[in-house]
Amino acid sequence: MSSLPVTRLTERDYLTLERAAQYKSEFVGDEMFAMSGGSARHSRLAGLVFSELDAQLKGSGCAPFTSDLRVRTPLGDQFYPDVSVGCAPIQNPDGSVDVYTNPVIIVEVLSPSTANYDRGLKFVLYREIPSLTDCLVFHYDAIHVEHYGRQPNDSWLLLQHHHGEDARIQLPSIQCELALGPIYAGAMDWPG
């Protein structure tokens, strides 16, 4: 995320600009922020997580989405998570097809330029999404994933730090399991 806001906007202004833009921007509060590009490793990690979830979710009524589909928070903030999972029917505000409001899982792959933002303000805003059950934060430089889960009292808890090639992440809300070894093996040889 760029450190300088482009301008102060309404959500409607943001959507008009974003839908015509040649690059992606996120909307936080009343500010629009241009997104920085990702590395080859970042792209591979996100792609491999997407592929694994896609294979496991076929026929389940749920599906993973790439960072081309925005997620909207109840406050109107809009983000492009690296991967999100939605279950049918996904809810599109005002009939829009490029944004939805009810993700179940959000995956962010950290990068040096976005790590503080992804774990800070963005995660605070993600937690406001009522349908969200899990948020996974993949580190780009080591086999390490932080798994945050919504608790029955609506609080969020760091469920586990997953380390190493044998680590597995259980996602009971979508009945999936992610094996970290194969995901990271397909990404770590790429520049990061």
Where are these regions (language model features)?
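Gly/Pro/Ser/Thr-rich low-complexity, intrinsically disordered segments predominantly at protein N-termini
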Residues: 1-192
